[in-house]
Amino acid sequence: MRRNPIIAALFFLLSLTTGFSQSKTIAERLGYPADSKLLIIHADDLAVAHSEDAASFDALDKHAVTSASIMVPCPWLTEVAAYAKAHPDMDLGLHLTLTSEWKSYRWGPIASKDTVPSLLDPSGYLWPDTDPAKQHIKAEEAEREIRAQIEKALSMGIHPTHLDSHMGVLFARPDLFAVYVKVARAYKLPFLAFLGPDTPKELLALLSPDDVLINGIVMAYPQVPADGWKDFYLNAIKNLKPGVTEFIVHLGHDDAELQAVTADHPDYGAAWRQRDYNVITSPEFKKLLEDNHVILVRWRDLKKLLN
């Protein structure tokens, strides 16, 4: 089967992060052979809606995903906090959120609005997309907000295992990336670095050999046809390289709630999230992981390497 070009592009990280590796690979530091294929299967966007939470909790309970991340400003945070406290060993990070993308379902910051005005659109919500966020957000206000999100999570009994960035806003400018890296190090948390062939040298210069960086990211994009969804992920498994790769999935049930939340937004919408859920919970997906000798790991494992 021909390799999907999207997969090829995303695996650029395998070579990009090599320069930051230590004398031992992450696999070796975790006790595996150097040529091991380690995989984090990661569910984004917990707390956006009950439908997303239910699908993600089910996938976590079934070990179909190994990790997930939480959007602290979102309305269903209390539900996620209850799950986190009931399942303290689950691998839950924070999906640091500086945008609010849905048409009729919006949220604002955790920090007081008067302390982060550059984060707000004219309606008083977080910016609806990455481009206006990139244009308007001041780095010092971004830092104030992401620290507020972390402290809010901690206050609710959530002990995050890692950090990443919703819609990649914190990768959009070097000063925002600097804030992201600074805060992750301050809280002693590993962070996802979404780097690619066009990553500015200023961003790369902010990374250190002490940072625990994964080697690759795979995520479905709008170019993947609905009838090719399963093949996209199965091909990705077959093409895994040695190192640590993360599959980023967006889970949910294609029900009335999620259809309303994601109205007029088919990309990452209800049907998209149902497809992701169907594939990663399927017996075929699990068997292919086993057949290709893929070792499932968590961000919690990587976090131990920082201590």
Where are these regions (language model features)?
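C-terminal domain-boundary segment and adjacent tail
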Residues: 191-194, 265-307
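Catalytic domains of cell-wall/extracellular-matrix polysaccharide-remodeling enzymes
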Residues: 139-212, 217, 222-229, 238, ...
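Bacterial N-terminal signal peptides
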Residues: 8-17
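Acidic (Asp/Glu)-rich catalytic clusters
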Residues: 29-31, 56-62, 79-91, 108-121, ...
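Structural preference for beta-strand elements that scaffold enzyme active sites
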Residues: 38-40, 65-69, 89-95, 160-164, ...
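Active-site gating loops and adjacent loop-to-helix segments of metal-dependent hydrolytic enzymes
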Residues: 107-133, 261-269
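N-terminal pre-catalytic segment of deacetylase/amide-hydrolase enzymes
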Residues: 3-4, 19-40
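A short alpha/beta connector and helix-capping loop motif
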Residues: 51-74
